[in-house]
Every structure is written in C-alpha cells, then in structure tokens.
UniProtKB/Swiss-Prot annotation:
Protein family membership: Belongs to the influenza viruses polymerase PB1 family.
Location of the protein in the cell: Host nucleus; Host cytoplasm
Residue intervals passing through the bilayer: none
Protein name, per record: RNA-directed RNA polymerase catalytic subunit
The UniProt record lists the keyword S-adenosyl-L-methionine: no
Sequence motif Nuclear localization signal, residues: 187-195, 203-216
Gene designation per UniProt: PB1
Span list, region Disordered: 53-82
The species this protein was found in: Influenza A virus (strain A/Chicken/Hong Kong/220/1997 H5N1 genotype Gs/Gd)
Protein origin, superkingdom: Viruses
Length: 758
C-alpha cells in the first residue's frame, strides 16, 4: 500500500506541518574514532569563557584551577562564566520569598530520601567510569568493583546497605595515604593448536595488585570520563559528554533529589515532569500572561537559546545555592549536599582514547594514548590539533585535564533549572518596580520568556533587563539564536505552541517500525506506539490505520512471515505454508506464524495472543503457550514489559507494553566472542550481581526496605523473611502443611550451606 505523502497535507494548517521540516527521519549521525578532540575543545572553551578569573593550585593533586566567580562584570555580549555570588544568593532569597516554605519542605523531603536510599540506586545507569580499571563499565560492575576495593582497603562498604553509608566510605577513602587496587591485564602468546596444528593466539587474563598514592587516587576519584555524544540530529559537529565515577555519583544523586523536589513545586519549571503534564504546566503560564495582558498591554514571547549553558555554569555557584537553601538544616545534611559541588570544583576530565595515526606509505597504524599528549612532539599533528594540545598542556596531570569551571553535560539538570527559574521569578512587578514584567519557562538550558509591557519600548527594556540579570549569574542568553514573537507562537523543548501546543509528530517517527527484540515484543511495541500516538500526538484515525498497515508489512518482511496463502517466497515460506494448510482456524494464527492481521485502530490495546485466543486451534494453543514447551521463554513473566523507545529528540523513553509469553518471546543469546576476552569475568560478576539484587527485591518488595535488625548478611535476611512469609501463608491457609514443611527444610539447607561456605 503506497501512499502519496502530499495527500497528507491537503487539509493541514501550516503550523502543524512545522514538524516535517525536522531532521528526524533516517539514521542519526554517529561518531567514529576518539572523542579526545571534542573533549579538548570543551576544556579549552570552558577556560576561555572564564579566562579573567583567578588561578590557584589544588594542594592535594597539584592541579591548576581557574575560579571565575565574582570576576569582572561583562562589558560586551560575549558569553562568560563570571557569576556574582551575592546576586545568586539574592535571587534565591526572592525565590523563597515568593514561595514561602519552598526550601524548608524540599529539605525535609530530601532528608527522608537520604535516609532511605540504598546503595543499589547506583547500579542504575549505563556506562560509568570505573576508576579501578580506568575505563568505562556497566554501572553495576563499576559499583561492585569499587565496593570490592573499598573492602580490601579496610573500609566497611556493603552492597545492601544505605547509600549514605557508602558515601561515608568514599569520604574516608580520600583520607587514606594509599589505596591498593587489582587491575586486569591480558597476556597474549602464540601456541600450536593440537587438533588443527595451526598457530593460534591464546589469551590469558592476569590480575595484578597496584598501589595508588593519595594523589593518584584523588585524581581518579575526581575524574569524569568523556565520550562523544552519539545520534545527535541537526548538528554539524559532534560534542563530548561526560560520565562520572562512583565516588561522585551518590553525592550528585542527593543534590538532584533536593533540586527535583524544588522543581516539582515551581510552576515555571519544565522538569521533572514530561509529556502531557509538562504541556499543561506550560499552557498555564502562557494563559496567565495572556489573560493579564488586558487590552492595554502588549505580550511578547522569546523562544530562548543560551550559549554553552554547561560551560558557563559553575560548581561554586551551586555550592552557594545549596548553602543558602539548606541554611536552617542539620549540619550532617548540609555537609552531604555540599560535597558534590566541591568535587565538581576540583574535577578532572579524562581525555578519552587519544589519537590514531596511520602512515599510508608503510601501512602502519599506531595509537597515541591521551597520557602521552603532555610531552609528545607536536610536529606530528595538524595545525588545529596542535593549537588545542598547546592550550591544554598546562592543565594536564596523569593524562587528565584539570577542569574546575563549568559543568559537564547533564550532571545538575535540576539544580541549574532552579537557578534559571529564580531569574524568571524576578520578573514580577513587585521586583521590576516598573511598567514591564516577565514570566516564563525553564527546563535545564532551554527557556521561553514571556514579557508584558504597555508598549514596544517597554518590551525591549524588559528583555534587556532579563538578559543583563542572567549575565550576573553566569547565564548567557544568545542574542543571535533567540527570537521574539507575539505571545501565542513559540517553541520550548521542541514543543511548538500556537494558541495551544501543536503535536510535533515527526519527533516520534523514529520509534515507529520493528524494534528487533523478538517477534512477540515487536508486535506488541509496534501497536502500542501507534496507540500512544493516537492518544498523545494527534495521530488521526486514517493516518493511524495507514501506519498500522505499513507496520504489519514491515513486520512481515523483517521476520519473513508473509501470510500462508501468499506467493512471496522466503526461507520460512515452506514451513509457514505447511502450518497454514494444517490449521483449521486460519484466523487464529499469529501474524508471525503466517496468520492474517486482525488489528485495527479499535483493538490496539489487546495483545495479539489474547485477540486471537478464541480463534486458535487447540493444539496450536498448546504449542504456543505451553510452559513445558522448551521454546517458551522460561524467564519469569511480568504482565507488563518495558521497551526503550527512541524519540528523535530528548532522552530515550521507557514505554510499557503488554507481554504475553509464548514460543515467540525468545531471548537471543549473547555474542560468544566476549567470553574469550578479559571481560568474561566481569560479565559473570555482573550477572551474579544482577541476580542477587533481583532475588533480594523479590523478598523485600518495598523499595525503601529497612535492614532487618541485627542481621548481618543478605542471605540470612532472605531466609528469615521466607520463614515469616511461609508461616503467615500457612496460618491463613494459603499453603498446605507439606509445602510449609518443605519451605522450612529448604531454609535450613541454605543456612547449612552458608555456614560451610564461611
């Protein structure tokens, strides 16, 4: 079914077609090679924005540090990071004045969070800088490695304790004179294979102990590893993003918890909510400004863009904000929250993999690791790289660059939003004390500013004042990239507002199509995406029906499961035709077994197995959903699964879809090649760790479980919990006496094994 796209636009108002101009179809650009150049750009730019600051040297690490705070007031429109502490504190005070009790209540909520968060919170997240191996690892592994090293160095770390206890260990680790770590290395040797008599490379993994001095350990603890941000659309150049290590993460988590709690209570904040809730919040602010601009007032909106938000922010300003927000709180709480900004003031940026050189004539390739950049002869580099390296050299220590000013991407999204909102808050008439006033929306570095005034001069004056106020706290509104319009038409975080939010449908385009998980999940995700877009994104019935037909077509081509009565020949058609002929009720066959499609836009909410269950032959039902069938996935079946959907813009979203386990919900096995590398042990550790965590959560389903009193290990806690639960179930008649006895027997066996293991 081929569609002429111009037909889609016959009745569409122009503003709704804005979304088709976005660079969202097709594959996004990915980066190749190293991110070293991008990271050096970031470090050099950040220092350039703060160049008039004061230089100092960190006494512990010897790193040169630039502090632009309370630096010169800007004299031109160039971006700069010279925030004035007193201005920031005043903005905070006014924010509190217009929201009585805001900080107090948020602190109380956060204290609760700090008391209850468990260490396993840090296992969430993807790649994390693992300081023990000096490279990136999955979060769970990096945490396990950190805890293991802490233990072997006499710290009390335990992986089922509270996060706050782990953070105490982090603090203690920084006072130690040295830390002993275990590093992995590979030995390669050529040996002759007995069977084939060929020479093969045999790899063995060695572990060796290494001592880190206090200085080296501190550098690693303060290091952010850098990578190139992938899949960014609409940009010519790539840019670097950072991933911090386990020492920093926990502290950042608590600061962001406090800031999130504040943002939730601020009507101008576009975080932490999303989707329709965010749109409603924004529409409220716009409505307020439009109803207040009676016939006498003009109302204009700036679709704002800030220049290099992260690189002009400063951790010292965040420290000042936290000090103010928590000023009436207990000392321990203030200390915990102030550590993250202090660590960021002393952060080091790891320069990534380094540079790859190749000689065309000699067919040689060689890698220059980042550690060598400090003293390698620069004649090998081209001019632009040479300039970068020369500039960054004074900042290098042990292959990392000292980067005191600036924040790396995505670290303090919530707290920086609070700073932005505090400036928007100053637009009330009681603060501007003149005829113009402003309000707006802030979401991390994105903002929309609504200015009301009796005439155009007033609007201009209002925007100017906003611009200059921002400069005082290190926010640089870009005059080139921001534009102003009559209120009613603007864009904010890729939502387009035109007397109400217009669905930016093309943003969702990348999430249509076949995900490639397995036949069962893909069918479910595909129809759920269409259903969700009908609910949230103005996907009309005709277009949805068309999307559905295109999806089914795509699905059949992907899994080669064309209808049993089709003429199309594929590898599977012989088997599928045979099944088609043997089946009495052909409508009952799943699409992935060559059956017909019974979906239409009215029944997208029903999983396909349920939709066709009554129509299936009995023996087909038995094969499809029989738990004894070795092909039915045996992992525990949750009724809802989560898929990661990639919209074209913004973070990957988690989307729920109905999961019915059948022979089609297979899980592909992991690529075997990893099992022959140094990663193998790490992989096994990670799986063990994940299994233990999952098991523990099964026993203690509430997420804020307190530790069972007086119990030392996870295993004992689970056994004691199992006994209690079994007794309750037995006494209430939910399980029989034999089952109860069997559970107690298993518990005793586990305890016995545990004792032998000790």
């Amino acid at each position: 079914m081929d569609v002429n796209p111009t037909l889609l636009f016959l009745k569409v108002p122009a503003q709704n077609a804005i979304s088709t101009t976005f660079p969202y179809t097709g594959d996004p650009p990915y980066s190749h090679g190293t991110g070293t150049g991008y990271t050096m750009d970031t470090v050099n730019r950040t220092h350039q924005y703060s160049e008039k600051g004061r230089w100092t040297t960190n006494t512990e690490t010897g790193a040169p540090q630039l502090n632009p705070i309370d630096g010169p007031l800007p004299e031109d429109n160039e971006p700069s990071g010279y925030a004035q502490t007193d201005c920031v504190l005043e903005a905070m005070a006014f924010l509190e004045e217009s929201h009585p009790g805001l900080f107090e209540n948020s602190c109380l909520e956060t204290m609760e969070v700090v008391q209850q968060t468990r260490v396993d919170k840090l296992t969430q997240g993807r790649q994390t800088y693992d300081w023990t191996l000096n490279r990136n690892q999955p979060a769970a592994t990096a945490l396990a490695n950190t805890i293991e090293v802490f233990r072997s160095n006499g710290l009390t770390a335990n992986e089922s304790g509270r996060l706050i206890d782990f953070l105490k260990d982090v603090m203690e680790s920084m006072d130690k004179e040295e830390m002993e770590i275990t590093t992995h290395f590979q030995r390669k040797r050529r040996v002759r294979d007995n069977m084939t008599k060929k020479m093969v490379t045999q790899r063995t993994i060695g572990k060796k102990k290494q001592r880190l001095t206090k200085k080296s350990y501190l550098i690693r603890a303060l290091t952010l590893n850098t990578m190139t941000k992938d899949a960014e659309r609409g940009k010519l150049k790539r840019r670097a993003i950072a991933t911090p290590g386990m020492q920093i993460r926990g502290f950042v988590h608590f600061v962001e918890a406090l800031a999130r709690s504040i943002c939730e209570k601020l009507e101008q904040s576009g975080l932490p909510v999303g989707g329709n809730e965010k749109k409603a919040k924004l529409a409220n602010v716009v409505r307020k400004m439009m109803t207040n601009s009676q016939d006498t007032e003009l109302s204009f909106t700036v679709t704002g863009d800030n220049t290099k938000w992260n690189e002009n922010q400063n951790p010292r300003i965040f420290l000042a904000m936290i000090t103010y927000i928590t000023r009436n709180q207990p000392e321990w709480f203030r200390n915990v929250l102030s550590i993250a900004p202090i660590m960021f003031s002393n952060k080091m940026a790891r320069l990534g993999k380094g540079y790859m050189f190749e000689s065309k004539s000699m067919k040689l390739r060689t890698q220059i690791p980042a550690e060598m950049l400090a003293n390698i002869d620069l004649k090998y580099f081209n001019e632009s790289t040479r300039k970068k390296i020369e500039k960054i050299r004074p900042l290098l220590i042990e292959g990392t660059a000292s980067l005191s000013p600036g924040m790396m991407m995505g670290m303090f999204n919530m707290l920086s939003t609070v700073l932005g909102v505090s400036i928007l808050n100053l637009g009330q008439k009681r603060y501007t004390k003149t005829t113009y006033w402003w309000d707006g929306l802030q979401s991390s570095d994105d903002f929309a500013l609504i200015v009301n005034a009796p005439n155009h001069e007033g609007i201009q004056a209002g925007v100017d004042r906003f611009y200059r106020t921002c400069k005082l706290v290190g926010i640089n509104m870009s005059k080139k990239k921001s534009y102003i319009n009559r209120t009613g038409t603007f864009e904010f975080t890729s939502f387009f507002y035109r007397y109400g939010f217009v669905a930016n449908f093309s943003m969702e385009l990348p999430s249509f199509g076949v995900s490639g998980i397995n036949e069962s999940a893909d069918m479910s995700i595909g129809v759920t995406v269409i259903k969700n877009n009908m609910i949230n994104n103005d996907l009309g019935p005709a277009t949805a029906q068309m999307a559905l037909q295109l999806f089914i077509k795509d699905y059949r081509y992907t899994y080669r499961c064309h209808r049993g009565d089709t003429q199309i020949q594929t590898r599977r058609s012989f088997e599928l035709k045979k099944l088609w002929e043997q089946t009495r009720s052909k409508a009952g066959l799943l699409v992935s077994d060559g059956g017909p499609n019974l979906y239409n836009i009215r029944n997208l909410h029903i999983p396909e197995v349920c939709l066709k269950w009554e129509l299936m032959d009995e023996d087909y039902q038995g094969r499809l959903c029989n738990p004894l069938n070795p092909f039915v996935s045996h992992k525990e079946v949750e009724s809802v699964n989560n898929a990661v959907v990639m919209p074209a813009h913004g973070p990957a979203r988690s989307m729920e879809y109905d999961a019915v386990a059948t022979t089609h919900s297979w899980i592909p096995k992991r690529n075997r090649s990893i099992l022959n590398t140094s990663q193998r042990g790490i992989l096994e550790d990670e799986q063990m760790y994940q299994k233990c965590c999952t098991l523990f959560e099964k026993f203690f389903p509430s997420s804020s479980y307190r530790r069972p009193v007086g119990i030392s290990s996870m295993m004992e806690a689970m056994v004691s919990r199992a006994r209690i639960d079994a007794r309750i179930d037995f006494e209430s008649g939910r399980i029989k006496k034999e089952e109860f006895a069997e559970i107690l027997k298993i518990c005793s066996t586990i305890e016995e094994l545990g004792r032998q293991g000790k």
